[in-house]
Amino acid sequence: MSFDVLTINPGSTSTKLAVYQGDKVLFEETVRHTMQEFADFNNVQEQFDFRWQVLRRVIDAFGYDVNNLDAVVGRGGLLRPVAGGTYMVTEKMLADLKTNKYGEHASNLGAMLAKKLADTLDIPSFIVDPVVVDEMLPIARFSGNELIARKSIFHALNHKAAGRKIAKKLGSDYEKLNFVIAHLGGGISVAAHRQGKAVDVNNALDGDGPFSPERSGSLPMNDFLEACFSGKWNKRELHDLIIGRGGMISYLGTNSMLEVEAKVKAGDEKAIQAFDAMAYQVSKEIGACSTVLHGKIDAIILTGGLARSDLFTSKIIEQTNWIASVIIEPGEDELEALNSGVQRVLAGLEKEKLY
């Protein structure tokens, strides 16, 4: 039996919507937003009514009768750490999102929009595998200093969706296999997945692991401390240097890997070195995760937008295919992943969780 599910993914520059009937897409739309549209909003929460109007306008334009919906699902926002799975949207969850208790991001609006529409139809609303999924082993939380614990912040939705897809292709279940999965995008996260749980992963947002097109990843601590107290930058500027303007931007002035690849193919020596270094660091992180799984790995999976680059993935494959076979599952279809999580719950294949 299949179910009609509306999926909502609010991003910093877009609102993505789709209605699925089972795994069939009835319609899908991406509405791009300009900075001018958000100019009068002081924070993400103030965008709620604007995003709600976008949602209603798109649904009306496609002529879809919302009374046919069985559930609504939104992209999970910044919440307290939770295990992976599909979560019912509750008042407790909404309270944390509305106050930005654990951080502010456009994805915080996902559950709020889903809940508002679902309540008018008397149907359930959900989120699936938010970025705060935390299944790390206790030993993996040690950073090397008691003041600071390692955190799990990664591309959980796409990691787990890719894991499920590849497990199915291998004739098994995600919960029965071991994978090292690398999401390659604006941020890069590499995780050891042991029988359905991401037991260790780099913090892809706050400075841990490989550098990416726009993030610095791990940095030598003493040198960074010198920069912090040099008087050249304030806290906000340093934050931007490591998260928004780090990585490839800091080396080559661009976060477009298409531009970087073009420079590499044109023989630009600096671009070649930076490109190779990023692939090297991803490969090294994959190797580290393989030790977490004691070398018992069913496959290494490369996913995310950068997994479409044959040049980039070939360098990773060359360094890691001795560990396990490398499978490429390019791109990230967040709407499909959101739908799949809810379809499993509605079909009784998986039980929803409470926040």
From Swiss-Prot:
Coiled-coil annotation: which residues?
A: none
A biological process (GO) of this protein is:
acetate metabolic process
Catalytic reaction(s) noted: butanoate + ATP = butanoyl phosphate + ADP
Which InterPro entries does the UniProt entry name for this protein?
A: Aliphatic_acid_kin_short-chain, Aliphatic_acid_kinase_CS, ATPase_NBD, Butyrate_kin
Query: Where does this polypeptide localize?
Result: Cytoplasm
What protein does this entry describe?
Probable butyrate kinase
In terms of HAMAP family, this protein maps to: Butyrate_kinase (MF_00542)
Taxonomy of the source species: Bacteria, Bacillati, Bacillota, Bacilli, Bacillales
* Molecular function as annotated in GO: acetate kinase activity; ATP binding; butyrate kinase activity
Q: Per its UniProt entry, which superkingdom is the organism in?
A: Bacteria
Q: Please provide one cellular component term from the Gene Ontology annotations of this protein.
A: cytoplasm
Write down the top EC class of this protein.
transferase
Q: Does the keyword Cell cycle apply?
A: no
Supply the NCBIfam families for this chain. butyr_kinase, PRK03011.1-5
Q: What is its EC number?
A: 2.7.2.7
Alphabetically ordered keywords of this record? ATP-binding, Cytoplasm, Kinase, Nucleotide-binding, Transferase
Query: What is the organism of origin for this protein?
Result: Listeria welshimeri serovar 6b (strain ATCC 35897 / DSM 20650 / CCUG 15529 / CIP 8149 / NCTC 11857 / SLCC 5334 / V8)
Q: Which family, according to UniProt?
A: Belongs to the acetokinase family.
